[in-house]
Amino acid sequence: MAARVCCQLDPARDVLCLRPVGAESRGRPVSGPFGPLPSPSSSAVPADHGARLSLRGLPVCAFSSAGPCALRFTSARRMETTVNAHQVLPKVLHKRTLGLSAMSTTDLEAYFKDCLFKDWEELGEEIRLMVFVLGGCRHKLVCSPAPCNFFTSA
């Protein structure tokens, strides 16, 4: 079963946040502890980083009770298709990261809610789950062997 998260716009930071639904994480467990987490320079991430969470490759802010700065959850199959007839999701998000105009936050929010989450819950695509930084987040990744890449496949 895929982790259940809700999609919320944080107007103060102008980012799209994915927050866990309920009090505990439902992600797949991985063997071994995460170990000590790097201390971010920003005070926006409290000490309750929640190292017990089980998804690999998340930035430190993902473990904050305030939620991650901005994350994109997708599947390998979705990476190969289009958001709509005109835009490919990785390119759209990469443009957004560079500060170029692309898809609006409202459109992204609708895409997450209507496409990705529905597929995970109905089709059980948890095994192909990938995690990417959406952009604007300066927090370091945890347990990630290589820098985040928008075009990485599962």
Swiss-Prot record:
Belongs to the orthohepadnavirus protein X family. May form homodimer. May interact with host CEBPA, CFLAR, CREB1, DDB1, E4F1, HBXIP, HSPD1/HSP60, NFKBIA, POLR2E and SMAD4. Interacts with host SMC5-SMC6 complex and induces its degradation. Interacts with host TRPC4AP; leading to prevent ubiquitination of TRPC4AP. Interacts with host PLSCR1; this interaction promotes ubiquitination and degradation of HBx and impairs HBx-mediated cell proliferation. Multifunctional protein that plays a role in silencing host antiviral defenses and promoting viral transcription. Does not seem to be essential for HBV infection. May be directly involved in development of cirrhosis and liver cancer (hepatocellular carcinoma). Most of cytosolic activities involve modulation of cytosolic calcium. The effect on apoptosis is controversial depending on the cell types in which the studies have been conducted. May induce apoptosis by localizing in mitochondria and causing loss of mitochondrial membrane potential. InterPro entries: Transactivation_prot_X (IPR000236). Its main location: host cell. Pfam families: X. The gene is X. Residues 68-117 are annotated as: Mitochondrial targeting sequence. A fraction may be phosphorylated in insect cells and HepG2 cells, a human hepatoblastoma cell line. Phosphorylated in vitro by host protein kinase C or mitogen-activated protein kinase. N-acetylated in insect cells. It comes from the Viruses. HAMAP family: HBV_X. Transmembrane segments: none annotated. This is Protein X. It is found in: Host cytoplasm; Host nucleus; Host mitochondrion. The keyword Transcription applies. GO terms for biological process: DNA-templated transcription; symbiont-mediated activation of host NF-kappaB cascade; symbiont-mediated arrest of host cell cycle during G2/M transition; viral genome replication. Keywords: Activation of host NF-kappa-B by virus, Activator, Apoptosis, Host cytoplasm, Host G2/M cell cycle arrest by virus, Host mitochondrion, Host nucleus, Host-virus interaction, Modulation of host cell cycle by virus, Transcription, Transcription regulation.
